[in-house]
Every structure is written in structure tokens, then in C-alpha cells.
């Protein structure tokens, strides 16, 4: 079960809010007090809420769902990209395009264009004219900045994790419209309404942003590792069951077919047959005795030649 600690939050400066004159009254229950005109966030309330968010992220990952990391402001951009890539999740760190989730069909067209340009770049743009190659390179770079983090998504994400719900208000609005769960860092100057998993904390400090993203990424990685271990255990148990003597799950390839067993036993029990040359060298009495072993009926009136014909 993913958990963080009060010590980590203090070290990251999570408790520092905005100036008291810019506060949102709806955040009042999360504010401890004021120091030098700056609101101080009550970490005793942040801690259980953040742990709830971490557990939710773990559960979502364990069932194979995706979490979209969103942080487009300068302080968050590089951190969001780094941590999302580390845990194998999609991200948006440059600019939120309108309709990125609510109009995903159109966005998929742009993603396809980006992949086509990347393929052409691998083949070498030099096959095109200098001006055309330059224009294609610029287009690819522009699309990469906006869509590079979601180009491997096959559908809209299942959850979004937002660093600053004020800056990312368009992303939050689209998630609400699609009824997607939102994990959001909410500072003292914003309202927590509409955020499913509120994490009251500093959303401006690079250290604090790095802490949030790192903890969420760690929870995701732990869930993936636990799921992978569980699958490996199930596979190993199945292998042991197939090797167990008398088990009904014995691999089919190890059990000979019924017809093959019958044929083998017939071949082993049936005496070897002789050719005509060998039969001609035998006396009639020996031929009759041999015929009995072969299950061939010989009449007393049969000549040696007729007997050989029946046995051959």
C-alpha cells in the first residue's frame, strides 16, 4: 500500500500556500494559519488525503488503467515529463489543446500525422526538397511538443493527475465533462470543488511539484511490480500443477494418442513376417507351424506352393 510521510512533505515545502489576500474561502478548512502574510497549509489534513490519492493511483494501475500527468507551467513541465516517462504513463507538459479529451477523434488525426512524420524522419527527410524538409521538421517538432506525451494512447485516459488546477482549468473542465476522476494539487488560492482527490499543497515550488509527481509515479511503479509478480506466481503454480504426478493437467504432448499405443502394442506382439524366399527353404510341417503363429488357416489338401502363397 503506497504511503507518504509528514517529513517528506515538510522537506518539500508542501505547507507553503499563497499570500493571504489571494486565498479562496473554500480552502479555509485546510489552512493552519498565516505567517508573514502567507497562508500555511495544515499538513495533518494533507497527509491522509495524499495517501488516499496514492492508493487510488495504485488501484487504477493494478487493473491496467492509465493516468494522464498534466503540468504545463514552466516549474512543472520537465518534472511531469520525466516522472510520467519513468512510470510509463502519458503526459501533457507543453500546452493543453482544446478538445484533447472531449474531441479525441480529431486529436488522433494529429497524432497519426506526427507518427507519419517521425517515420519519414527515420527514412531521411533529405529525399525531399530543402524547403519542404525544413517545413516538415518544424511541423513534427510542434506536434511533438503538444502531443508527444500522448501519442501512444489508444483512447482517452482513465484518470488525470493535475499539478495546478487553476493553470490547467481546461484540462479539469474536460475531465469533468467526461466524468473522469481527477487527482489535483490545490493551493490556497483555488477552490477544491469538483476535484475527486484533493491534495492541499504548494503548487508553485519546483521541489514540491517534484515531490508530488515522484510519489504518484512511485505508487504506479509499485502497483505494476506487484501485478507482474502476481502474474508470474500464477504461471509458476500452473507449471507445477502440470508436472504433478496423476494431475489432470498433464500436457497433451506428453500423453501418446490412444491409437498410437494400440498400434505400438500390435507391432510388438505380432511376430515378424517372412518373405517368399525364406518360406521356400522351409519344410511343409514347419510352414504349417509358422502359419499358426500368423493366424493363417492351412488345409490338409494344400500343397506347399499354395501354403506359401497364403503366407506371403
From Swiss-Prot:
Record-linked SUPFAM superfamilies: Ribosomal protein S2
GO BP term, example: translation
Pfam families in the record: Ribosomal_S2
Alphabetized InterPro entries for the sequence: Ribosomal_uS2, Ribosomal_uS2_bac/mit/plastid, Ribosomal_uS2_CS, Ribosomal_uS2_flav_dom_sf
One annotated GO molecular function: structural constituent of ribosome
Any one of the GO CC terms: cytosolic small ribosomal subunit
Stated name of the protein: Small ribosomal subunit protein uS2
Organism encoding this protein: Ruthia magnifica subsp. Calyptogena magnifica
Amino acid at each position: 500500500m503506497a504511503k507518504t510521510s509528514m517529513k517528506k512533505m515538510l522537506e518539500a515545502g508542501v505547507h507553503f500556500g499563497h499570500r493571504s489576500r489571494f486565498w479562496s474561502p473554500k480552502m479555509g478548512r485546510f489552512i493552519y494559519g498565516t505567517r508573514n502574510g502567507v497562508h500555511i497549509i495544515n499538513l495533518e489534513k494533507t497527509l491522509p488525503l495524499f495517501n488516499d490519492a496514492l492508493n487510488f493511483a495504485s488501484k487504477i494501475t493494478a487493473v491496467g488503467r492509465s493516468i494522464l500527468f498534466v503540468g504545463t507551467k514552466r516549474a512543472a513541465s520537465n518534472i511531469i515529463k520525466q516522472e510520467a516517462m519513468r512510470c510509463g504513463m502519458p503526459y501533457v507538459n507543453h500546452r493543453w489543446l482544446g478538445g484533447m479529451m472531449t474531441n479525441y477523434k480529431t486529436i488522433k488525426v494529429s497524432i497519426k500525422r506526427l507518427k507519419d512524420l517521425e517515420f519519414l524522419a527515420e527514412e531521411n527527410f533529405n529525399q525531399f526538397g530543402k524547403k519542404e524538409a525544413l517545413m516538415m521538421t518544424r511541423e513534427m517538432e510542434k506536434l511533438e511538443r503538444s502531443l508527444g506525451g500522448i501519442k501512444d494512447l489508444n483512447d482517452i485516459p482513465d484518470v488525470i493527475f493535475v499539478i495546478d488546477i487553476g493553470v490547467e482549468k481546461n484540462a479539469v473542465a474536460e475531465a469533468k465533462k467526461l466524468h473522469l476522476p481527477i487527482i489535483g494539487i490545490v493551493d490556497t488560492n483555488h477552490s477544491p470543488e469538483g476535484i475527486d482527490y484533493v491534495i492541499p499543497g504548494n503548487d508553485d515550488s519546483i521541489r514540491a511539484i517534484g515531490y508530488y509527481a515522484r510519489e504518484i509515479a512511485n505508487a504506479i511503479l509499485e502497483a505494476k511490480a506487484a501485478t507482474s509478480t502476481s502474474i508470474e506466481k500464477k504461471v509458476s503454480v500452473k507449471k507445477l500443477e502440470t508436472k504433478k504426478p496423476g494431475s489432470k493437467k498433464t500436457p497433451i504432448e506428453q500423453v501418446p494418442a490412444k491409437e498410437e499405443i494400440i498400434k505400438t502394442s500390435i507391432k510388438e506382439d505380432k511376430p515378424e513376417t517372412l518373405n517368399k524366399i525364406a518360406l521356400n527353404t522351409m519344410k511343409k510341417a514347419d510352414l504349417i507351424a509358422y502359419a499358426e503363429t500368423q493366424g493363417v488357416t492351412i488345409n490338409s489338401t494344400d500343397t506347399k506352393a499354395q501354403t506359401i502363397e497364403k503366407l506371403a
